[in-house]
């Protein structure tokens, strides 16, 4: 049944109509959640697990008494589907809806608030009636930058996720512009998907998946094949990609606390080399993952021997300097400055750290700070020609920036002056008009007084 017109015609309450004619949408078929579509939605697509959904709703007890309504608050209710943020009946019911659909749900207590209720409005063991309108839904933004949107087709098992360095076995299907360009089973190490022609967005998303999870990933160019594209697959530069990924199995990599100092130092040497290979290949996000491992393993390592301490400091210094370079390439200049700060905390006179921090600050238009760093480079190495050129660049950019500001402010002041002059002119015109009207009234009055005697008998 797709409407409740029958209920209107025979006088039945919507609750009674759903109880008699509603479709059982529970997996157990225990009539715990019954549904009637009041208004058919658009298209065939329905929300998936993890989607952010936007709804309007009215909630009533079985006796017809209203206990809640989003309409009364004049704003939609928003939640993530299938995450336990709402009652079970809603996670079940909204998952069956299409955009624009309005439906009625009748929910037994075990799919609502159960024996506890939700006092004072909802008593114990209450059967609830809802009218729900699905306004919109969209996938889960994994990193809140729009670069990776996940839509979960099948929920995974358990709560464990692969970590960086985990060995995973997945099935993937890649599409671009409606064309499938990749379909295979593949095993690889998370963070090293590039070695298997897998974009970095897959590595990132896998760290948020569970075993046997199946999802659709929408990757922006930054998390796809970027500006280079992928000629092997016929992918143009800056293409948006869609991947369907199933995580079949995984084995987690050792966590930092599971490794002794010797192992950490050995692994640091390995990942440093991997990071350098990625950097030289222009794979800066992949390089960040490798250099970041060194920081996670060694930054908080204590109780080292003198030899271990020197080795650890050397790896950390290289990692921070290389991370700064990667972040600058990724145009994440604030992070680049932070990494340089860490490097300079280990070696305050490090020329590379000072130079790279200066570069990042110059790109952030922090001209004085950048100039100061390049001057410090010259204190360390007076023969550094690049630093001298950068000081000249800072001075030039600062001058251009100041001149541009002066022009902007001059134009602003000119506009303000013109506006003030216009307002003064309007006031003067208004005053003149007012005086003219007064004079005309005086003349008319005088004329009437002169004519008045002639009108008398």
Swiss-Prot record:
Residues 50-138, 165-251 form the PPIase FKBP-type domain. Pfam families: FKBP_C, TPR_1, TPR_8. TPR repeats lie at residues 268-301, 317-350, 351-384. SUPFAM superfamilies: FKBP-like, TPR-like. The modification Phosphoserine is found at residues 13, 445. GO terms for biological process: chaperone-mediated protein folding. Inhibited by FK506 but not cyclosporin. Its EC number is 5.2.1.8. GO terms for molecular function: peptidyl-prolyl cis-trans isomerase activity. InterPro entries: FKBP4/5/8-like, PPIase_dom_sf, PPIase_FKBP_dom, TPR-like_helical_dom_sf, TPR_rpt. Coiled coil: none annotated. The modification N-acetylmethionine is found at residue 1. Residues 1-26, 420-457 are annotated as: Disordered. It is found in: Cytoplasm; Nucleus. GO terms for cellular component: cytoplasm; nucleus. Keywords: Acetylation, Chaperone, Cytoplasm, Isomerase, Nucleus, Phosphoprotein, Repeat, Rotamase, TPR repeat. Disulfide bonds: none annotated. It catalyses: [protein]-peptidylproline (omega=180) = [protein]-peptidylproline (omega=0). PANTHER family: PEPTIDYLPROLYL ISOMERASE. Part of a heteromultimeric cytoplasmic complex with HSP90AA1, HSPA1A/HSPA1B and steroid receptors. Upon ligand binding dissociates from the complex and FKBP4 takes its place. Interacts with functionally mature heterooligomeric progesterone receptor complexes along with HSP90 and TEBP. Interacts with IFI44L; this interaction modulates the kinase activity of IKBKB and IKBKE. Interacts with IKBKB and IKBKE. Immunophilin protein with PPIase and co-chaperone activities. Component of unligated steroid receptors heterocomplexes through interaction with heat-shock protein 90 (HSP90). Plays a role in the intracellular trafficking of heterooligomeric forms of steroid hormone receptors maintaining the complex into the cytoplasm when unliganded. Acts as a regulator of Akt/AKT1 activity by promoting the interaction between Akt/AKT1 and PHLPP1, thereby enhancing dephosphorylation and subsequent activation of Akt/AKT1. This is Peptidyl-prolyl cis-trans isomerase FKBP5. It comes from Pongo abelii (Sumatran orangutan). The lineage of its organism: Eukaryota, Metazoa, Chordata, Craniata, Vertebrata.
């Amino acid at each position: 049944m797709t409407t409740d017109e029958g209920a209107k015609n025979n006088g039945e309450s919507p609750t009674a109509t759903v109880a008699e004619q509603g479709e059982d949408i529970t997996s157990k078929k225990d009539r715990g959640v019954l549904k009637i579509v009041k208004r058919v939605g658009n298209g065939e697509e329905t929300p998936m697990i993890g989607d952010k959904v936007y709804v309007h709703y009215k909630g009533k007890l079985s006796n017809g008494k209203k206990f809640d309504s989003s309409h009364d608050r004049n704003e939609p209710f928003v939640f993530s589907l299938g995450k336990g943020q709402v009652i079970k009946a809603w996670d079940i019911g909204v998952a069956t809806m299409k955009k624009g659909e309005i439906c009625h749900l009748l929910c037994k207590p075990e799919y609502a608030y159960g024996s506890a209720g939700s006092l004072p409005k909802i008593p114990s063991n209450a059967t609830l009636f809802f009218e729900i309108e699905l306004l919109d839904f969209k996938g889960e933004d994994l990193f809140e930058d729009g670069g990776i949107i996940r839509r979960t087709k099948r929920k995974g098992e358990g709560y464990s996720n692969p970590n960086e360095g985990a060995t995973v076995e997945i099935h993937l299907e890649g599409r671009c512009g409606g064309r499938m360009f990749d379909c295979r089973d593949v095993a690889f190490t998370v963070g090293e998907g590039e070695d298997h022609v897998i974009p970095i967005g897959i590595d990132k998303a896998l760290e948020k998946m569970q075993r046997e999870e199946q999802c659709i990933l929408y990757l922006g160019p930054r998390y796809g094949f970027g500006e280079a594209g992928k000629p092997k697959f016929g992918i143009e530069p800056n293409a948006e990609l869609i991947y369907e990924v199933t995580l079949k199995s995984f084995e987690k990599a050792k966590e930092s606390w599971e490794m002794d100092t010797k192992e950490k130092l050995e692994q640091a040497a390995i990942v440093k080399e991997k990071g350098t290979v990625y950097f030289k290949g222009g794979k800066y996000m992949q390089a960040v993952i490798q250099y970041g491992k060194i920081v996670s393993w060694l930054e908080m390592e204590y109780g080292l021997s003198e030899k271990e301490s020197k080795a650890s400091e050397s790896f950390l210094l290289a990692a921070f300097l290389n991370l700064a370079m990667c972040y600058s390439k990724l145009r994440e200049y604030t992070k680049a400055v932070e990494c340089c700060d860490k490097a300079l905390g280990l070696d305050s006179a490090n020329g590379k750290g000072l130079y790279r921090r200066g570069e990042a600050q110059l790109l952030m238009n922090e001209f004085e700070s950048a100039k100061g760093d390049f001057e410090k480079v010259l204190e360390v190495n007076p023969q550094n020609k690049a630093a001298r050129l950068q000081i000249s660049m800072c001075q030039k950019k600062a001058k251009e920036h100041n001149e541009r500001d002066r022009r902007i402010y001059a134009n602003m002041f000119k506009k303000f002056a013109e506006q003030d002059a216009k307002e003064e002119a309007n006031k003067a015109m208004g005053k003149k008009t007012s005086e003219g009207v007064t004079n005309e009234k005086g003349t008319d009055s005088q004329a009437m007084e002169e004519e008045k005697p002639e009108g008398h008998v």
